[in-house]
Amino acid sequence: MDKTHTEYIDLTREISELSDRQKKFDLESVTDSLDDLDYSDDSNSPENELEILPEDVHTKKIIIDWTRHAESCSNLDSNNVHDTDEYPLRKTGYDNLNSHDKYISEKSNTNAIMMARKMTSKVKALAMYHPNISYIGCQQAVLLGSYLTKKEYQYDAVFASPTVRSIMTALMICRGLKVTIYVVPYINEHTNLAGSKDNQNTPLNSTLLKKQILYIKDWLENNWINNFDDIYVMNVLGDLRKEMTNMVNNPYSEDIIKKIDYIFNCKPNLKKDGGNVNDYGQKCAIFEEINNIIKILDQKFSNAKKSNLIERGVFDEDLESIHDTLKKITDKKFIRGPSVNFTILEMLEKIESEKIPNDDKFFIHQNLRKSCLNKFYTKILPISFNLNFINRNKITIAIMCVSHGGAMKKYFKSKYPSKNIPDHVLNTQIFREAIFINDNAIEAYSIDFNYYVPRKIRATYSNFETLNIDICRLGSLKGILNYPLYSPEWESKIKPKLSFKTLPPVNYATPDSKFYFENKDKYQESITDYEIMGGFNFIHN
């Protein structure tokens, strides 16, 4: 037995022998010591022995899309985005989403208050809060989802780490896919210099996560598309406008063009007139306008008219496809994203808690906190087959794992040393891996580190980030997820630090997040169900 294993056994014995009072004060120092040990020999090095696999598993090949989460608030606040706007002062709008327009419309704001906010944000981003994905992060996930939809790619299962940013990324990537997201340990990020105080990277327990994901799903349903612009939706509307422009002297096409132009111009015009970004959603009524467009197209594509168009040879399949897409993206089941299942996570939490109590109220059990991607293969895959979360009768299956850049880079650099791994893993970048299962063992076959390299939204799309509420503000999604949902007594923490006003917490909430205060009990009650429903296996009332 080598020194590392001996030290590990001694330290775990030390933990088990501590009295409850000692644990309260000493456990942090002990776990810090554990973090300093090198477990590369027995934890994160690529091993191929699977835990017990059902005898009737016929799967031979697994395609795994290892996906880095979308841009998080921590990435944004620390300026660790690798996606900077080359033309931050260009005209704002949607009329040409792929524009590289360098037209300057206003000067950037670099006053002392803004500089102070940026510095404070960088410090906080290190470890002081648990991040959701940013507004641009939402768009990154949406673009990946539209890419997969165009390729008609279907996953058998999607796995995400026990972090808000990875689950939220999966929700927005997989909109419209008939798939379930399973939250599992081991594929989380390594902790940073803050160690046991690292609120950014330490995975959360299922009790807290379920409340947060329920709130996020309701937030999406209440706000997305109407209060927030969606690149996919805007591109679909742009395609529809082109189709309508080609129809000369057609009354319904002229009406649709007017409605699309209203959607494209409403927020930019409000911004030009000095409007408050918080009010744009209420004033523009985008969701309502899209539904009005759908009604017009419904009349065109009634069964009788469709048959007549086909007979005349003028049926437009592209237009019908756009019509179907618009109906899909306004469906609440689509907007809420797929169901999120916590069965595996809760099962493992229970097993570990029977050995030793969890030492933290909000973090996942300490025995499950350490990042170890190899355990996804040796533990999580067998569990998923045993619980029938993966179809054991399929010869080839495809799954997605939403994980973290640092963990992915470290693990795959060791697993495939002859391959050139990228210096920077971009948000939503995919490493596509192919593995084989043979005699209860895994055989690594291939890896493509550049299967999907995302477009840099700030650099290549028109600048419309300023037209939307910053969901990394304390008063928006980040604040609600980190304070009231952790503890009702922390509601007042959503107040901006630089604000001198003293008002009830609801007054500091942005319009997208105020609904929390209208139904607090819903988000404070413990959720006993294993699954937070949503998506196309969810019947919306």
Curated annotation (Swiss-Prot):
**Location(s) in or outside the cell:** Virion
Domain of life the protein comes from: Viruses
Q: Which InterPro entries match?
A: His_PPase_superfam
One GO cellular component from the entry? Answer: virion component
- Record Gene3D superfamilies: Phosphoglycerate mutase-like
Swiss-Prot/TrEMBL keywords: Virion
Its primary localisation, in coarse terms, equals virion
Protein name (Swiss-Prot/TrEMBL): Uncharacterized protein R658
What species does this protein belong to? Acanthamoeba polyphaga mimivirus (APMV)
